[in-house]
Amino acid sequence: MTADVKERVWNKIDSQKAEIIKLASDLIRIPSENPPGNMSEIAAFVVGYLEQHGLVCEIYEPENGRINIICSLGEKTGKELVLNGHMDVVPAGDSERWDFPPFIPVIMLIAAPV
């Protein structure tokens, strides 16, 4: 990756910072612990977000609550890019052991040691 491409990517991220923070916060608020593995609520949110941004989504639910989302953008010609991720998180466990509630987003500024 050239320095120019890196700079353009970082500039794009900087220009979208508020939306990225809102998206991450919205995702954190949706419990998606596995087990039990019910992804219905978070999948509905993800599909809604992606469709708002022009993607066409298909939902596959091989088991109740176990959801896969396949989306496409634009015409199906030329090069393709596949992104693979997951929507579930490990169980939060004992909430008393958390510094902050696990499903309430907190933004902290952490300074590097001097």
Q: In which residue ranges do the predicted regions lie?
A:
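Acidic/His- and Gly-rich active-site-bordering loop/insert found
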Residues: 2-113
